[in-house]
Amino acid sequence: MDVFKRYQEQYSKYLNGLFFEEHQRFVKFSAAQFEKSMEKSQKTAQRDERLEAHISSERKSDYAPDYHCSTLTTSPTGEFEYNLLSYLSLTFPIGWLKDETRRAEFEEWVDYLCAQFDVLHGYAGLECILPYDPDEWEPHEYQVATHYYNVMPNCNAYAGLRDYKDAAKSIAWYTILGKSLSMRIEPQVWARLAEQYPEITVKTQANGVSVIKIDELPDVGDAGEPLPLNYQALNEALRPVIKAVPNRLHHLYAAPHFDAVKTYYWTHRWDNPNMKDGVLDPEGKTIKTAPILVENGETVRVPYGGVWQPFNHDGEAVHLEKGKPFPDVPKPEDLLAQTLWRLIGRDDGGTLEVVPSFR
């Protein structure tokens, strides 16, 4: 609630829309309506109920906002099995990057939030901002995020408990790690990063939350250009706490989107087989590959006869014939994706790896 009050006080002249749990839709923003909703939300929290709230520069949910403060909370006592992590997101205009004062203001928000909350993980940086109802815009987010690796796809971040309850999603301009995650990184790794890449800074709050920043301005991570080494080095260093096989990032099944396979590729987009301990081998010629993966579906057929095993949940390896449907096997209830099968043995003796592609 304090975050919402602070955001409203600083940016009220930009705010036009408001959505709290009792509204079920966006309504016109006013200071009076905001105070009324905040009072009701306080009572909601006291009843040990989750809270969803948004204040936005957009009056309606049809457009992407320049300013937005959004949360979906857990219950205060954490009694609900599927709602044990709270989500908080703040949006600011991209034009802030051009203004040194605004960039400092942005960093003040990062420091404030990390000092106020026992953060598990998070990030601050570039994002493809979508309207409140993002499903139809997922193909757009996919196109942007697969071309610019440092622009975060975030339309389903509110559901992070499904995927990221024990690991981080990715690195970013600012990468935020709670104490439980940052302690899993060996001290010598932090020391090596500081020596090799002085533009990577680490600031740790009194509560143990660490903020790792790369450069004064974010690199977009253009996939058509050589990727910045400092991002690749940080990715390598934090790989032990980044989710290796996450859920799918998108809901869609038809248009280009982040299905389970493409989500795996995205998670490993910064990986470089020619980098070791933050140092790129200039003579390295190893081609980046990924395992052969197939997400199950009604029309999906086995592409190669051989031994396949579930990759995104526990399951037994089975032999499957080429052209046959994949079997239906039990999977976790909170897994948005279908079973992601990995080929671990081929009848024809062929390769078990592919060069990852977002096309």
Residue ranges and their predicted role:
Residues 1-14, 132-289:
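C-terminal interaction module
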Residues 289-359:
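Compact beta-sheet-dominated domain cores in extracellular/mature segments
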